[in-house]
Every structure is written in C-alpha cells, then in structure tokens.
Amino acid sequence: MQKLKQQVFEANMDLPRYGLVTFTWGNVSAIDRERGLVVIKPSGVAYETMKADDMVVVDMSGKVVEGEYRPSSDTATHLELYRRYPSLGGIVHTHSTHATAWAQAGLAIPALGTTHADYFFGDIPCTRGLSEEEVQGEYELNTGKVIIETLGNAEPLHTPGIVVYQHGPFAWGKDAHDAVHNAVVMEEVAKMAWIARSINPQLNHIDSYLMNKHFMRKHGPNAYYGQK
C-alpha cells in the first residue's frame, strides 16, 4: 500500500498548491479495488507537517487497518461513493471558494462554455438539502447517499463532480490525481460561471452541439484531443 499512500499524500498536497483548501478544509482518497482498501488523509492534520506515512488505510466498512491517526471525518462519504461506482479510483472534497458558493446558493454550476464542456457533460448538479434526521443520524454516510440520489444512473466520470447543498464540492476521477485535476477545473468553471452570469444575468447555457463536440473529442470513443 506504500505506493498508493504516496500517491494520496501527493494528491492531498496538491490541494493547497492549487488554492483549493484553507487550513485543513479538504481531503483526498484513493482505492485499491483488488484489496478492498482505501487510503485517505488523516483528520485535522496540517498540510505543513503531513507525511506519506500519515495517510490512513481503511477497509470498506471504515475500519482502520493501517495508520496512527483517525481517518478523515468524511471517510464514510468516500466509501459510499466507492461502493456505488466501480469506475471511481479517487475522490476529493474541498471547500474551495467559488464551488462552495454555488453549493451554499443551492444551485447547479451551469455549463456556459467550452472550458466546462471539456470536463463536465452538462451542469454540475447540486444535491438537495439533508433533513434534520439525516444530519443527526449517519451524517457523512447520508451525504454520500444524497450524492448518489442526485447522480442517479449517470456515468460519474462524465460529470466528475457535484456540489452538496450548503456544504461544498466533491470531485472524483480514475485515480487521486485525476480527481484533484477535476476539483481544480470545477473551482475554475464555478468562478467563470459566477463572473459570466454577473456580466449577463440572462446568459444561456452552452449550445448542446458545442457541448457534445468538446466533451466527446476528449472523452468519447473516437477522442482525438492530446497525444496517444
């Protein structure tokens, strides 16, 4: 697990590097599907002092199998998403400013241009609010459940992120670094959407044919963006 712990450590260290976290407001995890184990950031440990060996390994029930620290308080959310979506290899949660602002406003991040369409096939959805019973019960598990409820049967890698109402963004990807990449993009397109709608409140969504072109040229079966 040492290699995966190093990858998760590096991905967590990317969060402050890209300006996605303040203090300890974020976490990254990755899963080893063959072993059924997840590596995740320890709860409340400062990035300045964190080391790869500080990463915590848990099984799919959340039991710590390796590590000296308690795992992230959001571990149950990560595990619920891994259980539901086999295509996920890494998950990120942050409170990045602009994506969190959309979450607090209770609004999906609208797909307004090609930057958005290069990564997200449609709006980045916002979940419903959790009930008092859901919050007082298994809060983190129920956060995962409301994300799944919102995504439905959609392919999660086609919309690799969501904003949880009154909470903040979660993003995911094929591995931890891919998930961080998508979290960075989500924050940028959230900022772009806010600015664009401030300039033109009547701004329409991106045309569907342009959305399809930009997403499919990067992610479709005949994708041709980048190098092989």
Curated annotation (Swiss-Prot):
Coiled coil: none annotated. SMART domains: Aldolase_II. Signal peptide: none annotated. GO terms for cellular component: cytosol. Zn(2+) binds at residues 74, 93, 95, 167. Substrate binds at residues 26-27, 43-44, 72-73. It catalyses: L-ribulose 5-phosphate = D-xylulose 5-phosphate. The keyword Isomerase applies. Catalyzes the isomerization of L-ribulose 5-phosphate to D-xylulose 5-phosphate. Is involved in the anaerobic L-ascorbate utilization. Belongs to the aldolase class II family. AraD/FucA subfamily. NCBIfam families: PRK08193.1, PRK12348.1. This is L-ribulose-5-phosphate 4-epimerase UlaF. It comes from Shigella flexneri. The gene is ulaF.
